[in-house]
């Protein structure tokens, strides 16, 4: 008979047990977190105050920045606290909350990226109908679905996490409460959780990625039909930022969640998780601003008005 324990908290093993590395990581991730907050909040404010950015593309981008703020804030503050603390713990309730928001925000982000791909197709493939087809009402509907679906999916996934049983050590080999190390640590109730995690991740990633791939196939066809070299260059420039963000985000998530949790995969996943929980939210504003002339112009106007 299994010796189940009434878990009240978990120990987060984090990235390293060496004190000198912990201090270094604290400084690095604090700087990354500050840049993430400034970049994403700055992007939201810029889109809000700039009339030239008042179109569907930047409407979706503002929501992507909003999700990245919460995505990073769900993990980073607790990680920073534990890097300097001798007691590297998280309560059971705190762990479930972290799991809930993490899964919800991942699903919201992948479907926002899909909506952005569809928006780019409408702008490039049907420019004359773009204004009527991508109206404010349509954009609100497209952005509402990811939030509702993401949070409902996360609620179900978190309830399955709640059904896990733990015995013996309650050490999570990670720097936040992630599903793979929790499943690896559990001693019962893992079957449903493990396979629903893989199936749900597979279905949602496949569906959203299919929308993106189909949208880009139509975009490519539309670009090849363009007679103007300048038009082609502008279209490629517009899509390049989004495509870069898609490849980085999906690549890391697929590596993390579409494999059965093993000791090796959990250890590898921990390194990958650093990238998509801290680095990607920091990079997104840079990706979308450095390669976007409209954002640069809007930024210069705001700076010139404030000087």
UniProtKB/Swiss-Prot annotation:
CDD domains: 7tmA_OR5M-like. It is a multi-pass membrane protein. Residues 45-52, 119-137, 216-235, 291-307 are cytoplasmic. InterPro entries: GPCR_Rhodpsn (IPR000276), GPCR_Rhodpsn_7TM (IPR017452), Olfact_rcpt (IPR000725). The keyword Cell division does not apply. GO terms for molecular function: G protein-coupled receptor activity; odorant binding; olfactory receptor activity. The chain crosses the membrane at residues 24-44, 53-73, 98-118, 138-158, 195-215, 236-256, 270-290. Disulfide bonds join 95-187. The keyword NAD does not apply. Residues 1-23, 74-97, 159-194, 257-269 are extracellular. Pfam families: 7tm_4. Glycans are attached at residue 3. It is found in: Cell membrane. Belongs to the G-protein coupled receptor 1 family. Odorant receptor. This is Olfactory receptor 5M3. It comes from Homo sapiens (Human).
């Amino acid at each position: 008979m299994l010796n189940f324990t009434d878990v009240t908290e978990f120990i987060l093993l984090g990235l390293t047990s060496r004190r000198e590395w912990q201090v270094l990581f604290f400084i690095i991730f604090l700087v990354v977190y500050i840049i993430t907050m400034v970049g994403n909040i700055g992007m939201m404010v810029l889109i809000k105050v700039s009339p030239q950015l008042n179109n569907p593309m930047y409407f979706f981008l503002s929501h992507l920045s909003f999700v990245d703020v919460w995505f990073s804030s769900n993990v980073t503050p607790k990680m920073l606290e534990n890097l300097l603390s001798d007691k590297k713990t998280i309560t059971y309730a705190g762990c479930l909350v972290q799991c809930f928001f993490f899964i919800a925000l991942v699903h919201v982000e992948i479907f926002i990226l899909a909506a952005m791909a569809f928006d780019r197709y409408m702008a490039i493939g049907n420019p004359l109908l773009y204004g009527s087809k991508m109206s404010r009402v349509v954009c609100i509907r497209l952005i509402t679905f990811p939030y509702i679906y993401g949070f409902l999916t996360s609620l179900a996934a978190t309830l399955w996490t709640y059904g896990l049983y733990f015995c013996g050590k309650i050490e999570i080999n990670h720097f936040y409460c992630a599903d793979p190390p929790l499943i690896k640590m559990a001693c019962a109730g893992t079957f449903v959780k493990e396979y629903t995690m893989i199936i749900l991740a597979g279905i949602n990633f496949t569906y959203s990625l299919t929308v993106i791939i189909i949208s880009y196939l139509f975009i490519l066809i539309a670009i090849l039909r363009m007679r103007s070299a300048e038009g082609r260059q502008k279209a490629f420039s517009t899509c390049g930022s989004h495509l870069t963000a898609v490849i980085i985000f999906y690549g890391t998530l697929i590596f993390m969640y579409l494999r059965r949790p093993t000791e090796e995969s959990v250890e590898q996943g921990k390194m990958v998780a650093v990238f998509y929980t801290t680095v990607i939210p920091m990079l997104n504003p840079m990706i979308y601003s450095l390669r976007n002339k409209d954002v640069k112009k809007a930024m210069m106007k705001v700076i010139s008005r404030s000087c």
